[in-house]
A protein has these predicted regions:
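Aromatic-lined carbohydrate-binding/catalytic grooves of carbohydrate-active enzymes
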Residues: 254-365
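Short, well-ordered beta-strand segments enriched in hydrophobic/aromatic residues
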Residues: 87-95, 507-515, 594-596
């Protein structure tokens, strides 16, 4: 194979100091077979033994590499000078055969040499991207919509030095070929370029992934304008976890027979099932838009009671803690010559809405936010699709579209920008959807229930109760799920159970997802205990004690069994959630009395008879040392009493005491008068 290799090195040192700062890779040295023989890291040249191919790729069903190339392709390599000092090469592939070929699964190095690998697997039309770890089942992952074909790999080059590398296809470079989601079809003589980026890191494989996905944002943009994310008035959406999207003619919004609005009843119902909706979105346009000469703004005006009635519903919803969204259809040309941004401004002004669903959009553009800002602060743009990294500066929220049914388990968009508010779109009418709620919970984001399609099956309340359980944990620990302490896929002692870590300022959460139908209970992952913290299972509400094994500390996890026939359906799976919390509370039982001690007084204490649940109320107390009568507040309840300390609705600590069935309810000695003998 003919190869033209151009090595031109100009070092360029930027002035920005990264939080992930590492020595940049100055060069990757190749042998004559395009194998990596050494890495120049600062002033140190590290030899690789054995060497590894620079890249691997597939043509059709066959796998090749730079060391063992396809006879149908040639490629050249050109060094790019980057302002950030990181290493970038352009790999140019040319189809030199007389056949039409499909080039795909282009990734750095070789699968055998990597600590972690991301590339395609299978033939799914929308979702093939998988993350591979040694001796583990591959994990299907979600990546940005402009990067489904990406390849990622990490290798160790020395005791503490590692290389993370990324390949990205240059869509605009395709000549005499066709771009598909995962493949590039090259006709004879066709060409396509891939960019290969490489940077150094140390630590576990997740550190390299975080550098590439979060620090470099997949090299989609060189600088990120964070101004929208810094705005206090827009931060509320990142702490929101349940929304419903419905038609304006839905029975839950308006009763045609009675001629009255029913939305507030729907919102009240939701409070008992899943803690209520942070957002409700009303859709009066598609699919009726286009049936007559009215444009989208006319359709809003023609609703019962007009825009004033919608404004009233928005106000009533906010009283219940729910923001009110309207929709916008950019494809509506209509018959009204009014500028769309002015039309949107007028609609927001008339309805006092709190946000806009941007139909068919995956980004916003500042014109949309500017139009909203003229009305009032805090109006959020919410796109139908998920913004790619270079579009994220224009919008603060988006969704995992329901076009991707049975979505991948791990969403790497969450790693890219943890502050970006993500909602998974789920539909109730098709089948039970516990997996939708479970995977959203595992990834630390919310759920949009799209109930446009008619149907409220008899199992809806059961599913909503599961959503309530996941959403409570998300809400009460929201700052962990929006902080930059996300580490995906911690090492576990067993396969088919996955653990994500979410570090915050004073506590750490672990979300766990299982597809083991037989259930699981046992030591699962490694932890670092200390005297100031303890471990609590927030899903099962029980205290946990780490166990030492092989010189390491391990924590026990537990997941429920589920029918094996549900594997592969949207109702598969089980979850757990474990927290390492600061020790603030101490509790004990003394007959009929619960003794509570707290080292903090700023917040609130809640006592639950059994597990916390939105369908019941907790006993709410001041944060102080106190004694509580169990029978007075909970009657004859026997079982676990869950005691929580919260500050501004955020869980700080939890402890549990068990009142064993049949325990005598003796009063405290100080409260019982002395009994004199009768004779």
């Amino acid at each position: 194979m003919k190869q033209a290799i151009l090595f031109t090195l100009i070092l360029f040192f930027g002035t920005t100091i990264s939080l992930f700062a590492q020595n940049p890779i100055q060069d990757i040295l190749l042998d004559s077979n395009l194998r990596v023989r050494a890495v120049q890291l600062g002033d140190q040249k590290i030899e690789l033994n054995p060497s590894t191919p620079l890249i691997s790729y597939s043509v059709g069903e066959e796998q090749f590499s730079s060391s063992f190339p396809s006879s149908k392709l040639t490629f050249s390599i050109e060094k790019v000078n980057r302002l950030d000092g990181e290493l970038e090469w352009i790999l140019s592939f040319t189809n030199t055969s007389a056949d039409t070929i499909q080039l795909h699964n282009v990734y750095p190095f070789s699968a055998e040499k990597t600590e972690v690998l991301i590339t395609g697997k299978g033939k799914h039309s929308l979702s093939r991207t998988h993350l591979f770890l040694p001796s583990r089942s591959p994990v299907n992952v979600i990546v940005p919509d402009n990067a489904w074909e990406l390849g990622y790999a990490a290798i160790s080059i020395a005791a503490k030095d590692k290389v993370a590398a990324l390949t990205r296809r240059d869509r605009e470079s395709i000549q005499n070929g066709t771009r598909r989601r995962f493949e590039t079809v090259l006709f004879p003589g066709g060409k396509v370029n891939y960019h290969l980026y490489a940077l150094s890191y140390s630590g576990d494989w997740q550190a390299g992934l975080t550098r590439v996905f979060q620090e470099k944002m997949l090299f989609d943009l060189s600088e990120f304008d964070n101004s929208l994310f810094d705005r206090e008035d827009l931060k509320w959406i990142r702490h929101s976890y349940v929304m419903h999207l419905m038609y304006a003619w839905d029975k839950f919004y308006y009763d045609l027979e009675k001629g009255e609005y029913t939305l507030q009843d729907f919102l009240e119902r939701g409070k008992k099932l899943y803690g209520g909706d942070e957002v409700i979105s009303i859709w009066p346009t598609w699919p009726t838009l286009g049936l007559d000469q009215r444009n989208q703004f006319d359709l809003f005006k023609d609703l019962p009671g007009g825009l004033e009635a919608m404004k009233n519903q928005a106000s009533l919803s906010r009283e219940k803690g729910t923001r009110f969204f309207v929709c916008y259809n950019p494809w509506d040309e209509g018959t009204n010559s009014k500028n769309h941004f002015e039309g949107l401004y007028d609609l927001l002004l008339a309805t006092d809405a709190d946000g806009v669903v941007l139909d068919t959009k995956a980004e916003a553009g500042r014109e949309f936010q500017d139009a909203a800002d003229r009305v009032k602060p805090g109006v959020v743009m919410y796109s139908e699709g998920m913004a790619i990294p270079k579009a994220m500066p224009t919008i603060v929220s988006g969704r995992v579209h329901n076009a991707l049914y049975y979505p991948p388990m791990l969403n790497l968009n969450k790693l890219i920008k943890p502050e970006f508010a993500i909602f998974r779109v789920a539909e109730l009418f098709k089948e039970k959807i516990r997996r939708e709620f479970a995977t959203a919970f595992f990834n630390g984001y919310g759920t949009e229930l799209n109930i446009m399609a008619p149907g409220q099956p008899d199992w809806v309340e059961e599913q909503y109760a599961f959503l309530g359980k996941t959403s409570r944990i998300l809400r009460e620990n929201t700052f962990n799920f929006t902080a930059r302490g996300f580490t995906p896929l911690l090492p576990t002692r067993v396969d088919s159970l996955w653990v994500n870590e979410w570090k915050g300022e004073e506590k750490t959460l672990y979300t766990i997802y299982s597809i083991r139908p037989q259930g699981f209970k046992g030591l699962l992952y490694e932890v670092e205990p200390n005297e100031e913290t303890h471990f609590v299972d927030l899903w099962h509400h029980k205290l946990l004690s780490p166990m030492e094994k092989d010189g390491k500390w391990w924590i026990e996890a537990q997941t429920e069994a589920f029918p094996e026939y549900e594997l592969g359906t949207n109702n598969e799976g089980a979850v757990d959630c474990i927290a390492q919390l600061p020790i603030v509370l101490k509790a004990s039982l003394d007959g009929d009395f619960l003794n509570i001690q707290t080292s903090r007084s700023k917040g609130q204490i809640r006592v639950w008879a059994g597990a916390p649940n939105y369908a019941k109320d907790a006993l709410e107390l001041e944060a102080k040392v106190q004694q509580v009568s169990i029978s007075e507040h909970f009657g004859r309840f026997e079982g676990d009493l869950v005691i929580q300390y919260l500050e501004d609705g955020i869980l700080v600590d939890e402890t549990i005491v068990n009142l064993k069935p049949g325990t005598p309810r003796t009063a405290c000695p100080a409260c019982v008068p002395l009994v004199q003998p009768c004779c």
